[in-house]
Amino acid sequence: MSKPIVAIVGRPNVGKSTLFNKLIGQRLAIVEDTPGVTRDRLYGNCEWQNHNFLLVDTGGIEPSVDDGILLHMRQQAQLAIDTAQAILFVTDLRAGVTAQDADIANMLMRSGKPVVLVVNKVDSLGAPPLELYDFYSLGLGEPYPVSSVHGHGTGDILEKICEYLPDQREEVEEDDRITDVSYTHLQGKSCGTAGLL
């Protein structure tokens, strides 16, 4: 059985790669304050409760720019969106809601995929800052405050994203019924595709 895919998308420098690293529990993605560091899709395993899924980090989406590298990054993000079962849309509390955020939100709504709106860089604990409520204007429902640096709020977004993923306990029961012959076939098949990721 293939794992469900969850894509992390957003404009440049909102903390997507930091969040990716925090959620997979290791530093796989390079993190810098310079836009364009992440250019291709990067995959990592993520586990939460009874769910095991592939998390995909993407480069920053710049909807209105068509130069070579930025266009490539946008195409890679679109591929991640197309293959994902659910999407984490990361925004930045400090920058507030931007025109780029609104453009990306519209693109995600057109995809028809379930989206969890993540408002990153909420680094203090306690009552959510009033600026958080501005993110309702994106039309994607409840904004989830997160600090990808400190890990605050990551459990909440994982809980929410798992609501959109198939219940893997049922799949485990189905896997138990696979015969030895078909298990060997599946095992060989997955060994051949693991290197492609």
Model-derived features with residue positions:
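Conserved C-terminal guanine-recognition region of P-loop GTPase G domains, centered on the G4
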Residues: 78-141
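Switch I (G2) and immediately adjacent beta-strands of P-loop GTPase domains
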Residues: 33-65, 79-86
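Conserved glycine(s) of the Walker
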Residues: 15, 153, 192
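Canonical P-loop GTPase G-domain recognition
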Residues: 124-172
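A conserved segment at the C-terminal end of the G1
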Residues: 17-28, 195-197
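Hydrophobic anchor at the beta1->P-loop junction of P-loop NTPases
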Residues: 8, 31, 182, 196
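Conserved small/polar residues in nucleotide/adenosyl-binding loops
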Residues: 184-189
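P-loop (Walker A) phosphate-binding loop of NTP-binding proteins
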Residues: 11, 22, 34
